[in-house]
């Protein structure tokens, strides 16, 4: 019986070691920063003064709703990042979008342009009097950028 518990201990320790190694590899490959936050975060931006330069989340869902914001003439810059999880950005009508959206592993849908799998990305080349220059990155998960319907 003593031999059984010894082998059981070895098996459990081995499985635990494999789990720790797998988590370490995952964190390294997908560049996960839990210090950026874990959970769901939602932002409803109504003015240029209320818009941050960047929105970042470690693990979870990040929603940035710009549908009520009056964009100034020219270019407005926005950098968004979720290490593991989902990123959702809502853009008002009448605002062009340029920039880049990428998911290291996952799905990207930006205003109907889609890509998925490893290194999914969509380039944005919109022009106009009001432009959002968007950088959207997800390590593992999905990006969805859509236009608000008014």
Q: Which residues make up each language-model segment?
A:
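Intrinsically disordered low-complexity regions specifically enriched for long asparagine
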Residues: 1-2, 13, 17, 87, ...
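Hydrophobic membrane-insertion alpha-helices, especially the h-region
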Residues: 9-26
């Amino acid at each position: 019986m003593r031999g059984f518990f010894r082998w059981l201990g070895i098996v459990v320790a081995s499985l635990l070691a494999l789990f720790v190694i797998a988590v370490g590899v995952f964190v390294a490959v997908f560049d996960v920063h839990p210090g950026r936050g874990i959970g769901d975060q939602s932002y409803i931006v109504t003015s240029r003064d209320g818009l941050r330069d960047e929105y970042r989340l470690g693990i979870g869902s990040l929603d940035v709703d710009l549908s009520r914001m009056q964009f100034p003439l020219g270019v407005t810059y926005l950098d968004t990042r979720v290490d593991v999880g989902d990123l959702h950005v809502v853009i008002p009508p009448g605002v062009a979008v340029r920039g880049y959206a990428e998911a290291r592993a996952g799905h990207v849908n930006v205003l109907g342009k889609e890509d998925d799998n490893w290194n999914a990305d969509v380039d944005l080349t919109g022009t106009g009097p009001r432009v959002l220059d968007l950088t959207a990155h997800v390590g593992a998960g999905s990006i969805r950028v859509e236009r608000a319907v008014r």
